[in-house]
């Protein structure tokens, strides 16, 4: 019998209390307990970026972070960022630029992109975008369309126009 531990956290603004196994990863907790399946689990080693979520405002890998480590934290998933409208322009640009194909990497790409655009006060260079996304793998697109979409959003945000 595995011992469980209580955790309390906020997920996408909602208070959550649960009993979790000490070794359960945050990504699995989000997917299995809360049915927030936009957080994908790919490599389970923190290198592919598919499990990227925000914890207390910083991006973390949900496959490396234990659910018990999120006790008391505020977690934002792709569902929360999408529902809030915070990433609507990024999602629209990804769609317009065909920056997604199978979609498996897309949630992690969008979460990482939202952090990039929030922490830089200018339009990033294409090389800076590629460097920032270096922890997010895509096996389908070749990254060109992803970088195009991100630069498009950065330019639009700087000019104050809608994308």
Go through each PLM region and give its residues.
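Signature of N-terminal electron-transfer/Fe-S-associated modules in redox systems
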Residues: 1-163
């Amino acid at each position: 019998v595995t011992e469980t531990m209580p955790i309390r956290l906020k997920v996408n603004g909602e208070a959550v209390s649960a009993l979790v196994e000490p070794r359960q990863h945050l990504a699995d907790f989000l997917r299995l307990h809360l049915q927030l399946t936009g957080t994908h689990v790919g490599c389970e080693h923190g290198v592919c970026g598919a499990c990227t979520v925000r914890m207390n405002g910083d991006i973390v890998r949900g496959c490396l972070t234990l659910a018990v480590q999120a006790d008391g934290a505020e977690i934002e998933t792709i569902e929360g960022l999408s529902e809030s409208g915070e990433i609507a322009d990024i999602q629209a640009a990804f769609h317009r630029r065909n920056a997604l194909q199978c979609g498996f990497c897309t949630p992690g790409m969008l979460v990482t992109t939202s952090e990039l655009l929030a922490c830089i006060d200018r339009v990033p260079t294409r090389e800076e975008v590629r460097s920032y996304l270096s922890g997010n793998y895509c096996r389908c697109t070749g990254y060109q369309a992803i970088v195009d979409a991100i630069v498009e959003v950065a330019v639009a945000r700087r000019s104050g126009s809608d994308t």
